[in-house]
Amino acid sequence: MQNLNGRFAAVLPAGGLGKRMGGNIPKQLMLLGGKPVYRYSLETFLEMEESAEVVMAVPADWKDHFEKEFSHPKLKIVIGGAERWQSVENGVNALTSSAEFVLVHDVARPFVSKEIIRDVCETLITKGSCLVAKPAVDTIKIAADGKVQKTIDRNTVWMAQTPQAASIALLKKLYGRIAAEPLNFTPTDEASILEYFGENVYIVKGNVANDKLTTPEDFEIFASRTR
């Protein structure tokens, strides 16, 4: 294994308001096992020697709260954008270390493992841009207006997760191209931006533990993992 220490930065988009969760505070600030959701993945990245720095993009109205609640020498908190990809762009532009690569991870995936993060780092160095994804286990249907159109071979389907990773220089170049010629769609992750511009994106196998916290039902399931 190569020496990965200090070669990577992390950007953690935490700007969503989690409307599907309900409540009056962002879901990333809700307590999970007595600790705010965002702290789980944030602390995992901060603990890793591979990480040179971590930037977290948060809602503008909550920036002071985050800064008062948690600080770390490797952590910088910035204001997120209107869309997730713009929050990531703000985070990437705020990086100041000598790191070559960036891993983007949703704080709503609190149980990402250090093993998966290291697998992403290794894949990024040996192959190129990559994302974590888990293989589909259910039969996948394409439907329109409530009517099934066709069935997809699930062996070719992967459910995207995070981290998603690329070189910092590459992402900055692509953000520059978007500024010059805006996209005709709203990307929901970094991989879709890379794909749009013809970049190869490799898969790192994920797992159920790395699923995203989205609904109140998810919250109950995730809370049971902290007991």
Task: Describe each region flagged by the PLM.
Residues Q2-D61:
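N-terminal glycine-rich phosphate-binding loop and ensuing alpha1 helix
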Residues Q2-G6, W158-R227:
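Conserved alpha/beta core of the MobA/IspD/sugar-nucleotide pyrophosphorylase nucleotidyltransferase superfamily
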Residues L31, F111, T151, A165, ...:
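Short aromatic/basic micro-patch
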Residues K76-I79, R154-M159:
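Short pre-catalytic strand/loop immediately N-terminal to key active-site residues, enriched for Gly-Thr
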Residues K63-E69:
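Acidic helix N-cap motif at the loop->helix transition within catalytic regions
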Residues F8, K74-K76:
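Short, conserved active-site loop motifs that form the nucleotide-linked donor/cofactor pocket
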Residues R7, A52-V54, F101, G128-S129, ...:
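Residues at the starts of beta-strands that form the adenosine-phosphate
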Residues K76, R84-A144, Q161, A166:
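Conserved beta-loop-beta/alpha segment of the NTase-like Rossmann-fold superfamily
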